[in-house]
């Protein structure tokens, strides 16, 4: 019996412990502000450059209006233990740079002269330099043309002459097979609108840095030989990209960035191959000879700059490429062959001159160079340079817009420019089964920017996060809002992104401060840069763009604070709520797994699909809490009775008085109606409204017999009424009877339900009391057992200690007596010896 009772006690204890554990393990939604989480985003980037306003160079003019000065101390923060996906072929930064470079060119050409008046008949003849005694074979490349133009007065014309390259004019009579054409026109007149480049500008680019506005960041991939697509394991966050030179070219990429180790080939899985070299190859372009530039008035306020004469050698321009090209090109071909079989490398098969040739701008002149020597089989010569023959064109089709062209005014004196080849643009076509033909191409300038921006992506900082927590918001109390201080760098905010959620949450307040202070710091830096260079900055649409970047950060911060306010978490870095956490939101992961093994970035990806549901529940909970808080605050009005006599509340008292009087009148009317109903039940009704007719009793009602009559009462009187008022009264009476019976039934059911509820509650309380008494008995029993065991233990210990003490005392006494008896034993021994 005792064993059974002990088993029962242990079972109850286990059940209680399990119940306490279940109740204690319930998780609640906790809001965190300042978590290192980001998401892919598209936003307006602003640019920085080392532009000089006093320079007349075209890019400097554009950069002065569009860019702020560069940061002298750029920051880069590594993010350990983070893997990020990149896609260079779907990068909004490339599209933005494309639009910006188009704006650069269009702004540079906007104030320049349109050459529409030059679409006239040109009378041309072959030109030969009179100052050059060398036998020249290329003299036919220039034509000496005369034509009529409008003078300063629109009704007057005059005849002028100019030298044109053969590539810039075409004969009017295209059917003449003799080749003795004398009448020409400009090549663009039937296709594009040509603008003459302003004479005081050049096209030498300067590095441009693209920067993310506050509230956003640029993620950079630092993996070696990264192909621009897929996952990157070594990432960092920066505020600006490296300096990118907007060099316009085809076939070859000039003055770009180099690969860190091996040659990297990037493919968009369509028909484009971007090759990034691991070492630069010098290319030196030269236009020998000396042009003299004249000017012709072609209308009021319009000047056409023409070539008057060429002094010296008139041979074509050329570019010299270092012989190391052959080795690098052979390595590149081998890498491509290893990935694809049956490959044939050829020069460009044909098309626009800008695509079939290497088109670059050198010193203001547009060079069109034949690159066949670069992409055909090499002769094995390892000395000297590779010389590319080039042609100069003054009328060029612009790559920025279809149907637009540019006339490059002639440049005086010799021209020479040195660049570095850092990449190649290749295209391939597939013929048959696994047969590829690869050739150099160009024209799509986005590939130039994509080669530089492949390792960058823009992300938006999402500092608000939700996660399960063990704490619950129990009471509604007023708390002082924490004020975030200023201090750390904004980029350091993402430094804890690779840490686990538990480790990152320890410094959450610091993270939140970094977020806000970083936003403020970025804006202050931007504003100080603008103020410091306000004598250089010419505010235009680009200035408005900078101001928009500043306003965007404040809008994002205010939006976050508004969301936190809707949840009752304004000004808090960690906010507890009373919304239960649903384990399905976290894929049934345990609390320890979430906080010990996952980063905030991984956690955000897991619960992102449930964010809307969680946020909605947080808003509903806060609304309910606001209602509860309002009700609680309304109870405070009872604390001061003296305010009841305030004159401002008299109208409220009058309203209450009217409501009480109306209630009394209503109760009186209801009592009268109830009295009438009671009388109706007793059989009373106005005589004028009733007529007695016999009716047969139902089987459920027994017949009654009158006391002084011997006849049975076979019926009772019912009313047979006629007339509107009588019918209305009868209907009203029946309605009241029906309502009375139903109300009586409902009241009886309610009374019975309340009685059962009272009995069940009483039984439950009795069971709880019995359980309490039983548990108290168990606790008392085990307490007594523990007390008895302790007493027995103490008694046993005391007895053992006493016995040991007695033995020790007895031993000490024996030793002492032995020592005391030593003289006696000596004396007795001496006595025996003397006897």
From Swiss-Prot:
One GO molecular-function entry: structural molecule activity
Sequence segments annotated as region (V4): 369-390
PTM (free text): Highly glycosylated by host. The high number of glycan on the protein is reffered to as 'glycan shield' because it contributes to hide protein sequence from adaptive immune system.
Glycosylated position list: 81, 131, 135, 144, 148, 175-176, 180, 190, 227, 234, 255, 267, 278, 284, 290, 322, 330, 342, 370, 381, 385, 420, 582, 588, 597, 609
InterPro entries according to UniProt: Gp120_core_sf, Gp160, GP41-like, HIV1_Gp120
Region V2: start-end pairs: 145-189
Keyword terms: AIDS, Apoptosis, Clathrin-mediated endocytosis of virus by host, Cleavage on pair of basic residues, Coiled coil, Disulfide bond, Fusion of virus membrane with host endosomal membrane, Fusion of virus membrane with host membrane, Glycoprotein, Host cell membrane, Host endosome, Host membrane, Host-virus interaction, Lipoprotein, Membrane, Palmitate, Signal, Transmembrane, Transmembrane helix, Viral attachment to host cell, Viral envelope protein, Viral immunoevasion, Viral penetration into host cytoplasm, Virion, Virus endocytosis by host, Virus entry into host cell
Name of the protein: Envelope glycoprotein gp160
Gene it is expressed from: env
């Amino acid at each position: 019996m005792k064993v059974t009772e002990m088993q029962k006690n242990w079972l109850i204890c286990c059940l209680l412990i399990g119940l306490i554990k279940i109740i204690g393990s319930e998780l609640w939604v906790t809001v965190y502000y300042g978590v290192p989480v980001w998401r892919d985003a598209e936003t307006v980037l602003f640019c920085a450059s080392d532009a000089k306003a006093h320079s007349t160079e075209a890019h400097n003019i554009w950069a002065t209006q569009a860019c702020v000065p560069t940061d002298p101390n750029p920051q880069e923060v590594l993010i350990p233990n983070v893997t990020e996906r990149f896609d260079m072929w779907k990068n909004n930064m490339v599209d933005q740079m494309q639009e910006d470079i188009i704006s650069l060119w269009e702004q540079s050409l906007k104030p320049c002269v349109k050459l529409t008046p030059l679409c006239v008949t040109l009378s041309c003849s072959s030109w030969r330099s009179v100052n050059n005694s060398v036998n020249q074979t290329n003299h036919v490349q220039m034509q000496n043309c005369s034509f009529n133009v409008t003078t300063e007065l629109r009704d007057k014309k005059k005849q002028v002459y100019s030298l044109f390259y053969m590539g810039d004019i075409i004969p009017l009579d295209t059917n003449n097979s003799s080749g003795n054409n004398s009448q020409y026109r400009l090549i663009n007149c039937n296709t594009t609108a040509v603008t003459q480049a302003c004479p005081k500008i050049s096209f030498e680019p300067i590095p441009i840095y693209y920067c993310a506005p506050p509230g956003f960041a640029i993620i950079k991939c630092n993996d070696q030989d990264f192909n621009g697509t897929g996952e990157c394991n070594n990432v960092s966050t920066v505020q600006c990209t490296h300096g990118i030179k907007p060099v316009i070219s085809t076939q070859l990429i000039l003055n770009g960035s180099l690969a860190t180790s091996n040659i990297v080939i990037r493919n968009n899985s369509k028909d484009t191959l971007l090759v990034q070299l691991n070492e630069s190859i010098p290319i030196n372009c030269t236009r020998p000879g000396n042009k003299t530039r004249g000017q012709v008035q072609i209308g009021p306020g319009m000047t056409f700059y023409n070539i008057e004469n060429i002094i010296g050698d008139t041979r074509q321009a050329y570019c010299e490429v270092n012989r190391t090209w052959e080795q690098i090109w052979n390595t590149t071909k081998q890498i491509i062959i290893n990935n694809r079989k049956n490959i044939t490398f050829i020069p460009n098969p044909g098309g626009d001159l800008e695509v079939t040739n290497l088109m670059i701008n050198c010193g203001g002149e547009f060079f069109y160079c034949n690159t066949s020597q670069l992409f055909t089989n090499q002769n094995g010569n390892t000395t000297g340079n590779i010389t590319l023959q080039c042609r100069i064109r003054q009328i060029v089709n612009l790559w920025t817009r279809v149907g637009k062209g540019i006339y490059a005014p002639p440049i005086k004196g010799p021209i020479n420019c040195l660049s570095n080849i850092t990449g190649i643009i290749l295209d391939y076509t597939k013929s048959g089964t696994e047969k590829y033909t690869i050739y150099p191409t160009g024209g799509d300038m986005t590939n130039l920017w994509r080669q530089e921006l492949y390792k960058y992506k823009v992300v938006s900082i999402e500092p608000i996060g939700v996660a399960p927590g063990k704490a619950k918001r129990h009471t509604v109390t007023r708390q002082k809002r924490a004020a975030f201080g200023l201090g750390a760098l904004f980029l350091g905010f993402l430094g804890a992104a690779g840490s686990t959620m538990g480790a990152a949450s320890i410094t959450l307040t610091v993270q939140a401060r970094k977020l806000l202070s970083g936003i403020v710091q970025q804006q202050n830096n931007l504003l100080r840069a603008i103020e410091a260079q306000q004598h250089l900055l010419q505010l235009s649409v680009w200035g408005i763009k900078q101001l928009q970047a500043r306003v965007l950060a404040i809008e994002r911060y205010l939006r976050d604070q508004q969301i936190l306010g809707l949840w009752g978490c304004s000004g808090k870095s960690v906010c507890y709520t009373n919304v239960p956490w649903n384990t399905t939101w976290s894929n049934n992961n345990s609390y320890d797994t979430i906080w010990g093994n996952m980063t905030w970035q991984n956690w955000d990806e897991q619960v992102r699909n449930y964010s809307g549901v969680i946020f909605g529940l947080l808003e509903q909970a806060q609304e309910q809490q606001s209602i509860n808080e309002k009700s609680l605050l309304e109870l405070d009005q009872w604390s001061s009775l003296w305010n009841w006599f305030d004159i401002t509340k008299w109208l409220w008292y009058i309203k209450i008085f009217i409501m009480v009087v109306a209630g009394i009148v209503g109760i009186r009317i209801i009592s009268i109606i109830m009295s009438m109903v009671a009388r109706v039940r007793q059989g009373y009704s106005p005589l004028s409204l009733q007529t007695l007719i016999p009716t047969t009793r139902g089987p459920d009602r027994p017949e009654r017999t009158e006391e002084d009559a011997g006849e049975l009462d076979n019926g009772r009187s019912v009313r047979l009424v006629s007339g509107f008022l009588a019918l209305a009264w009868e209907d009203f009476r029946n309605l009241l009877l029906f309502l009375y019976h139903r109300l009586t039934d409902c009241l009886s059911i309610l009374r019975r339900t309340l009685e059962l509820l009272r009995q069940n509650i009483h039984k439950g309380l009795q069971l709880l009391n019995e359980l309490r008494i039983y548990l108290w008995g168990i606790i008392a029993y085990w307490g007594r057992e523990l007390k008895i065991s302790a007493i027995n233990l103490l008694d046993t210990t005391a007895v053992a200690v006493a016995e040991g003490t007695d033995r020790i005392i007895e031993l000490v006494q024996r030793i002492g007596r032995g020592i005391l008896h030593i003289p006696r034993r000596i004396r007795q021994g001496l006595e025996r010896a003397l006897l």
